[in-house]
Amino acid sequence: MSSMNKRVFDILRELDSLVDFSRAKLQWDILIILATKGPSSTTEISQTINTSRKSIIDAIRKLVDKELVTKVKGDIYGLSEKGEKLLESFDSIMSINVTDKPDSSIESNSISLTNIAEYFYMLEILKMALLNKQITIDKASHELGISKQTLKYYIETFTENKLLKVVNQESVLGKSKKIYVLTDESRKLVSRLPELTRLKRNLPLKILLKLTGSYRYEIALTKVMLFNVISIPVLMYLKDQLGILEAIWLYVIILLPLLSIFAEIFNRI
Protein backbone atom coordinates (compact mmCIF):
# COMPACT_ATOMS: atom_id res chain seq x y z
CA MET A 1 0.00 0.00 0.00
CA SER A 2 1.33 3.44 -0.91
CA SER A 3 2.11 5.95 1.84
CA MET A 4 -0.85 8.10 0.70
CA ASN A 5 -3.28 5.16 0.92
CA LYS A 6 -1.90 4.17 4.32
CA ARG A 7 -2.47 7.72 5.54
CA VAL A 8 -6.06 7.65 4.25
CA PHE A 9 -6.90 4.42 6.04
CA ASP A 10 -5.18 5.59 9.22
CA ILE A 11 -7.41 8.68 9.19
CA LEU A 12 -10.51 6.57 8.49
CA ARG A 13 -9.69 4.35 11.47
CA GLU A 14 -9.22 7.43 13.65
CA LEU A 15 -12.55 8.90 12.54
CA ASP A 16 -14.34 5.59 13.06
CA SER A 17 -12.90 5.20 16.56
CA LEU A 18 -14.02 8.69 17.63
CA VAL A 19 -17.52 8.61 16.15
CA ASP A 20 -18.82 5.29 14.85
CA PHE A 21 -20.30 6.32 11.50
CA SER A 22 -22.48 3.24 11.14
CA ARG A 23 -24.16 3.67 14.53
CA ALA A 24 -24.06 7.41 15.27
CA LYS A 25 -25.40 9.41 12.32
CA LEU A 26 -27.17 11.83 14.67
CA GLN A 27 -23.85 12.71 16.30
CA TRP A 28 -22.36 13.45 12.88
CA ASP A 29 -25.37 15.58 11.95
CA ILE A 30 -24.77 17.65 15.09
CA LEU A 31 -21.06 18.02 14.35
CA ILE A 32 -21.85 19.19 10.81
CA ILE A 33 -24.36 21.76 12.07
CA LEU A 34 -21.93 23.12 14.66
CA ALA A 35 -19.19 23.27 12.03
CA THR A 36 -21.34 25.17 9.53
CA LYS A 37 -23.53 27.34 11.76
CA GLY A 38 -21.24 27.76 14.75
CA PRO A 39 -22.37 27.44 18.39
CA SER A 40 -26.07 26.53 18.53
CA SER A 41 -28.71 25.68 21.11
CA THR A 42 -30.22 22.21 21.36
CA THR A 43 -33.54 23.68 20.20
CA GLU A 44 -31.95 25.15 17.06
CA ILE A 45 -30.21 21.87 16.28
CA SER A 46 -33.44 19.94 16.88
CA GLN A 47 -35.36 22.17 14.46
CA THR A 48 -32.61 22.03 11.84
CA ILE A 49 -32.53 18.23 11.56
CA ASN A 50 -36.15 17.61 12.60
CA THR A 51 -35.28 15.40 15.57
CA SER A 52 -36.62 15.49 19.11
CA ARG A 53 -34.76 17.76 21.52
CA LYS A 54 -34.33 14.85 23.95
CA SER A 55 -32.47 12.84 21.27
CA ILE A 56 -30.30 15.87 20.54
CA ILE A 57 -29.45 16.32 24.23
CA ASP A 58 -28.54 12.62 24.58
CA ALA A 59 -26.32 12.75 21.47
CA ILE A 60 -24.63 15.98 22.61
CA ARG A 61 -23.94 14.41 26.01
CA LYS A 62 -22.06 11.61 24.25
CA LEU A 63 -20.15 14.12 22.14
CA VAL A 64 -19.22 16.07 25.28
CA ASP A 65 -17.99 12.83 26.88
CA LYS A 66 -15.82 12.26 23.80
CA GLU A 67 -14.56 15.85 24.13
CA LEU A 68 -15.73 16.68 20.59
CA VAL A 69 -18.29 19.27 21.73
CA THR A 70 -18.15 21.78 24.56
CA LYS A 71 -20.78 23.88 26.30
CA VAL A 72 -20.43 27.56 25.39
CA LYS A 73 -23.03 28.86 27.82
CA GLY A 74 -26.41 27.72 29.06
CA ASP A 75 -27.98 25.50 26.40
CA ILE A 76 -25.56 26.54 23.64
CA TYR A 77 -22.87 24.14 22.41
CA GLY A 78 -19.99 24.45 19.98
CA LEU A 79 -17.16 22.36 18.60
CA SER A 80 -14.22 21.77 20.91
CA GLU A 81 -10.65 21.95 19.68
CA LYS A 82 -10.69 18.16 19.36
CA GLY A 83 -13.93 18.33 17.36
CA GLU A 84 -12.47 20.89 14.98
CA LYS A 85 -9.40 18.70 14.46
CA LEU A 86 -11.69 15.73 13.74
CA LEU A 87 -13.40 17.58 10.89
CA GLU A 88 -10.06 18.88 9.66
CA SER A 89 -8.87 15.26 9.48
CA PHE A 90 -11.85 14.45 7.33
CA ASP A 91 -11.20 17.46 5.10
CA SER A 92 -7.64 16.25 4.61
CA ILE A 93 -8.79 13.07 2.86
CA MET A 94 -11.33 14.71 0.54
CA SER A 95 -10.69 13.80 -3.10
CA ILE A 96 -7.82 11.45 -2.17
CA ASN A 97 -7.74 8.12 -4.01
CA VAL A 98 -8.11 5.08 -1.79
CA THR A 99 -7.12 2.37 -4.23
CA ASP A 100 -3.95 0.35 -4.55
CA LYS A 101 -3.88 0.47 -8.35
CA PRO A 102 -0.98 2.59 -9.67
CA ASP A 103 -1.93 2.51 -13.38
CA SER A 104 -4.28 4.65 -15.49
CA SER A 105 -7.33 2.84 -14.13
CA ILE A 106 -6.80 4.50 -10.76
CA GLU A 107 -9.11 7.38 -11.68
CA SER A 108 -12.13 5.17 -12.38
CA ASN A 109 -11.51 3.07 -9.28
CA SER A 110 -10.97 5.89 -6.80
CA ILE A 111 -13.34 7.00 -4.08
CA SER A 112 -13.85 10.72 -3.74
CA LEU A 113 -15.05 11.31 -0.20
CA THR A 114 -16.75 14.61 -0.94
CA ASN A 115 -18.60 14.98 2.35
CA ILE A 116 -19.39 13.30 5.62
CA ALA A 117 -22.84 12.20 4.46
CA GLU A 118 -21.26 10.30 1.57
CA TYR A 119 -18.86 8.55 3.93
CA PHE A 120 -21.70 7.66 6.29
CA TYR A 121 -23.80 6.13 3.54
CA MET A 122 -20.76 4.39 2.10
CA LEU A 123 -20.21 2.60 5.42
CA GLU A 124 -23.92 1.86 5.92
CA ILE A 125 -24.33 0.39 2.44
CA LEU A 126 -21.11 -1.62 2.71
CA LYS A 127 -22.24 -2.85 6.10
CA MET A 128 -25.63 -4.00 4.81
CA ALA A 129 -24.14 -5.66 1.74
CA LEU A 130 -21.49 -7.37 3.88
CA LEU A 131 -23.98 -8.82 6.37
CA ASN A 132 -26.72 -9.72 3.89
CA LYS A 133 -24.64 -10.65 0.81
CA GLN A 134 -26.88 -8.43 -1.32
CA ILE A 135 -29.16 -5.40 -1.01
CA THR A 136 -32.02 -3.79 -2.91
CA ILE A 137 -32.75 -0.07 -3.10
CA ASP A 138 -36.37 -0.44 -1.92
CA LYS A 139 -35.55 -2.27 1.30
CA ALA A 140 -32.31 -0.41 2.06
CA SER A 141 -33.92 3.01 1.64
CA HIS A 142 -36.74 2.01 4.00
CA GLU A 143 -34.32 0.84 6.69
CA LEU A 144 -32.07 3.89 6.36
CA GLY A 145 -35.06 6.23 6.45
CA ILE A 146 -34.20 8.07 3.23
CA SER A 147 -35.91 8.35 -0.14
CA LYS A 148 -35.27 5.82 -2.90
CA GLN A 149 -33.98 8.62 -5.11
CA THR A 150 -31.39 9.70 -2.52
CA LEU A 151 -30.18 6.16 -1.91
CA LYS A 152 -30.12 5.46 -5.65
CA TYR A 153 -27.81 8.45 -6.10
CA TYR A 154 -25.35 7.13 -3.50
CA ILE A 155 -25.52 3.54 -4.76
CA GLU A 156 -24.91 4.65 -8.35
CA THR A 157 -21.95 6.72 -7.12
CA PHE A 158 -20.48 3.73 -5.30
CA THR A 159 -21.17 1.50 -8.30
CA GLU A 160 -19.23 3.90 -10.54
CA ASN A 161 -16.39 3.81 -8.00
CA LYS A 162 -16.35 -0.01 -8.13
CA LEU A 163 -17.51 -0.44 -4.53
CA LEU A 164 -20.72 -2.17 -5.60
CA LYS A 165 -21.80 -4.06 -8.67
CA VAL A 166 -25.33 -4.50 -9.95
CA VAL A 167 -26.76 -7.95 -10.65
CA ASN A 168 -30.09 -8.66 -12.33
CA GLN A 169 -31.84 -11.34 -10.29
CA GLU A 170 -34.96 -13.17 -11.43
CA SER A 171 -37.66 -13.72 -8.82
CA VAL A 172 -39.83 -16.81 -8.39
CA LEU A 173 -42.56 -15.09 -10.43
CA GLY A 174 -40.14 -14.49 -13.28
CA LYS A 175 -39.73 -10.78 -12.64
CA SER A 176 -36.25 -9.29 -12.85
CA LYS A 177 -34.97 -7.02 -10.08
CA LYS A 178 -31.69 -5.25 -9.47
CA ILE A 179 -29.60 -6.27 -6.47
CA TYR A 180 -26.25 -4.86 -5.40
CA VAL A 181 -23.30 -6.86 -4.08
CA LEU A 182 -19.78 -6.07 -2.89
CA THR A 183 -16.88 -5.95 -5.34
CA ASP A 184 -13.31 -7.09 -4.74
CA GLU A 185 -12.35 -3.43 -4.27
CA SER A 186 -14.92 -2.90 -1.52
CA ARG A 187 -13.89 -6.12 0.22
CA LYS A 188 -10.37 -4.70 0.48
CA LEU A 189 -11.81 -1.58 2.07
CA VAL A 190 -13.90 -3.67 4.49
CA SER A 191 -10.81 -5.55 5.65
CA ARG A 192 -9.16 -2.25 6.67
CA LEU A 193 -12.00 -0.68 8.67
CA PRO A 194 -12.33 -2.05 12.24
CA GLU A 195 -16.10 -1.59 12.48
CA LEU A 196 -16.77 -3.57 9.31
CA THR A 197 -14.20 -6.22 10.18
CA ARG A 198 -16.01 -6.89 13.47
CA LEU A 199 -19.33 -7.16 11.66
CA LYS A 200 -17.90 -9.70 9.24
CA ARG A 201 -17.19 -12.04 12.18
CA ASN A 202 -20.51 -11.38 13.95
CA LEU A 203 -22.42 -14.64 13.42
CA PRO A 204 -25.22 -13.88 15.95
CA LEU A 205 -25.95 -10.64 14.10
CA LYS A 206 -26.08 -12.40 10.74
CA ILE A 207 -28.53 -14.97 12.13
CA LEU A 208 -30.65 -12.24 13.74
CA LEU A 209 -30.84 -10.27 10.50
CA LYS A 210 -31.78 -13.40 8.57
CA LEU A 211 -34.54 -14.39 11.02
CA THR A 212 -36.04 -10.89 11.13
CA GLY A 213 -35.60 -10.16 7.42
CA SER A 214 -33.61 -7.02 8.19
CA TYR A 215 -30.49 -5.31 6.82
CA ARG A 216 -29.55 -3.42 9.99
CA TYR A 217 -29.22 -4.29 13.68
CA GLU A 218 -31.38 -1.37 14.80
CA ILE A 219 -34.27 -2.47 12.58
CA ALA A 220 -33.91 -6.10 13.67
CA LEU A 221 -33.94 -5.04 17.34
CA THR A 222 -37.13 -3.02 16.80
CA LYS A 223 -38.80 -6.03 15.19
CA VAL A 224 -37.71 -8.29 18.07
CA MET A 225 -39.13 -5.90 20.65
CA LEU A 226 -42.40 -5.55 18.72
CA PHE A 227 -42.66 -9.32 18.29
CA ASN A 228 -42.16 -9.94 22.01
CA VAL A 229 -44.55 -7.18 23.08
CA ILE A 230 -47.28 -8.75 20.95
CA SER A 231 -46.36 -12.40 21.52
CA ILE A 232 -46.17 -12.53 25.32
CA PRO A 233 -49.79 -11.42 25.99
CA VAL A 234 -51.09 -13.66 23.18
CA LEU A 235 -49.11 -16.61 24.50
CA MET A 236 -50.44 -16.10 28.01
CA TYR A 237 -54.00 -15.89 26.71
CA LEU A 238 -53.74 -19.03 24.53
CA LYS A 239 -51.32 -21.05 26.65
CA ASP A 240 -53.76 -23.94 27.24
CA GLN A 241 -54.71 -24.23 23.57
CA LEU A 242 -51.41 -24.27 21.71
CA GLY A 243 -49.84 -27.56 22.81
CA ILE A 244 -46.39 -28.09 21.28
CA LEU A 245 -46.63 -24.71 19.55
CA GLU A 246 -46.43 -23.05 22.95
CA ALA A 247 -42.95 -24.47 23.57
CA ILE A 248 -41.77 -23.48 20.09
CA TRP A 249 -43.20 -19.98 20.43
CA LEU A 250 -41.62 -19.53 23.86
CA TYR A 251 -38.29 -20.73 22.47
CA VAL A 252 -38.42 -18.05 19.74
CA ILE A 253 -39.35 -15.36 22.29
CA ILE A 254 -36.23 -16.25 24.28
CA LEU A 255 -33.94 -16.87 21.29
CA LEU A 256 -34.41 -13.53 19.52
CA PRO A 257 -33.45 -11.29 22.49
CA LEU A 258 -30.47 -13.55 23.23
CA LEU A 259 -29.29 -13.20 19.64
CA SER A 260 -29.69 -9.42 19.96
CA ILE A 261 -27.56 -9.37 23.11
CA PHE A 262 -24.82 -11.58 21.67
CA ALA A 263 -24.83 -9.58 18.42
CA GLU A 264 -24.09 -6.42 20.42
CA ILE A 265 -21.41 -8.18 22.50
CA PHE A 266 -19.68 -9.58 19.40
CA ASN A 267 -19.74 -6.12 17.83
CA ARG A 268 -17.74 -4.75 20.75
CA ILE A 269 -15.11 -7.48 20.87
From Swiss-Prot:
InterPro entries per UniProt:
ArnR1-like_HTH (IPR038723), HTH-type_ArnR (IPR053515), WH-like_DNA-bd_sf (IPR036388), WH_DNA-bd_sf (IPR036390)
- Please provide an example of a Pfam family that matches this protein in its UniProt record: HTH_45
Q: SUPFAM superfamilies, from UniProt? A: Winged helix' DNA-binding domain (SSF46785)
Q: Which residues bind DNA?
A: 42-65
Per the entry, induction is:
Not induced under starvation conditions.
The record's Gene Ontology cellular component field reads: plasma membrane
Cytoplasmic side of membrane: 1-217, 263-269
Which chain regions cross the lipid bilayer? 218-238, 242-262
Q: Which residues lie on this side of the membrane: Extracellular?
A: 239-241
Q: Which GO-annotated molecular functions does the record name?
A: DNA binding
Tree of life domain: Archaea
Instruction: State the annotated membrane topology for this chain.
Output: Multi-pass membrane protein
Q: Which UniProt keywords apply?
A: Activator, Cell membrane, DNA-binding, Membrane, Transcription, Transcription regulation, Transmembrane, Transmembrane helix
Q: Localized where?
A: Cell membrane
| Record keyword Manganese present | no
Report the protein's function.
Answer: Involved in regulation of archaellar gene expression. May activate flaB transcription upon nutrient starvation by acting on the flaB promoter.
Q: Which named protein is this?
A: HTH-type transcriptional activator ArnR1
Q: Please give the organism.
A: Sulfolobus acidocaldarius (strain ATCC 33909 / DSM 639 / JCM 8929 / NBRC 15157 / NCIMB 11770)
